[in-house]
C-alpha cells in the first residue's frame, strides 16, 4: 500500500525520467491496458504561464495567441510536435523500439511481446483518428534542438463530447514515482 504521507505521485517516462502527468489528474488504463488516458481540462493559459514565467505570459497575450491551455500538457511542459502520418509512424516505431528494449531488460520477453502487440493495435487506432489528434513530447533536457526520436510520445484527443481532452501515454512507458523524485 502506498505511503499516504509521500504525497501525490508523479508519472514519469521510463526512458528519460521526464514528467508526463501527476496522480491528481484523473487517469485510467484503456485499450485493454495498453495506454493511460489522462483526462485534462482547459485552464486559463495566462494564469498557468504566469505561475511559471510571467514574461512569457505577457508576451503570449500581447502576441494574440490563444490563452487556453490543457492542464495536463501545461503541467508537464509537453512540447507540441508537428507530425504527418509518415513522421508519426517513424516516431512511434523509434519510441517503441527503445521502449521494448527497456521492457525486455527489466521485465522479460513475454511482457515485451505483449507491448509490441498492444502498441501495434493502438497505433492502428491512432492512425484511423489521425486528423483529430495532436502530438506532444517532453522538453529535451538541454532545451536545444528537437527532442530525441525515442522520447515519449503523448497523444492528445477529445472524447465524443469534443470538449473533454484526453492525453494518452503507453502504459509500459510510464512509471509511478512517489514524492516527486526523479529516480
Question: For each predicted feature, which ranges?
Answer:
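Non-catalytic accessory regions used for complex assembly or targeting
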Residues: 1-151, 157-183
